[in-house]
Amino acid sequence: MPVISMKQLLEAGVHFGHQTRRWNPKMKKYIFTERNGIYIIDLQKTVKKVDEAFNFMREVASDNGTILFVGTKKQAQESVRDEAIRSGQYFVNHRWLGGTLTNFETIQKRIQHLKKIERMEADGTFEVLPKKEVVLLKKEQEKLERFLGGIKDMKGLPDALFIVDPRKERIAVAEARKLHIPIIGIVDTNCDPDEIDYVIPANDDAIRAVKLLTAKMADAIIEVNQGEELTEAEVAPVEEKATEETTEA
């Protein structure tokens, strides 16, 4: 049984592509028809591709891998942040800083600087500093948090990227490809699907469509993690029983 239904996709407007004059011919195989100058995406193919992406997400999560959610366009910012947090992963939902992946050491230095400012605020250092200096530090903190807050606890490079609109996030795509990090992407009719390992052909401009698909990818991670918790809960009583029996013996 597919992880997402045609009805859900239709209700969220996933099938609406871009205007016919704004398209990438490589997306032809994912297009069902054209209506009033707009391409209509073949949702049967979307259902299948969501399944493939969902299963890959589960694989990554099963190996304790990390996934970086990326979506800096207005329609994606909230969903990308909320679903990454909900699934215990990382996100970039404002401007992608060049070198986020390919120059990870430098990015880490900026993150350490952000954490240093946070410690200064927490331990009372701000109270003994001149007001002007505190204002500047707070501005810097706000800026760093905006761009790096979603990855400040990410210890190393992610094992996969989930991207909303690879065309807009082309720098993130290029960096991931250079480092051979697999990409799952919500790909509209104006994108190049060849750059994406797991293509989800869909409307990347409708908030409801983006939210539905991003949440579904997060669900894959949560399912795996909840499964692990359940297994541990089931194993604990067995171990306790075995210990009791050994003690009695």
Curated annotation (Swiss-Prot):
Coiled coil segments of this chain: none
A Pfam cross-reference name: Ribosomal_S2
GO CC terms in record: cytosolic small ribosomal subunit
Spans traversing the lipid bilayer: none
Keyword annotations from UniProtKB, A to Z: Ribonucleoprotein, Ribosomal protein
InterPro entries (UniProt xref): Ribosomal_uS2, Ribosomal_uS2_bac/mit/plastid, Ribosomal_uS2_CS, Ribosomal_uS2_flav_dom_sf
Domain of life: Bacteria
Molecular function terms from GO: structural constituent of ribosome
GO BP terms in the entry: translation
Gene3D superfamilies in alphabetical order: Glucose-6-phosphate isomerase like protein, domain 1, Helix hairpin bin
Family named by the database record: Belongs to the universal ribosomal protein uS2 family.
Protein name, entry field: Small ribosomal subunit protein uS2
Lineage, uppermost ranks: Bacteria, Bacillati, Bacillota, Bacilli, Bacillales
Gene assigned in the entry: rpsB
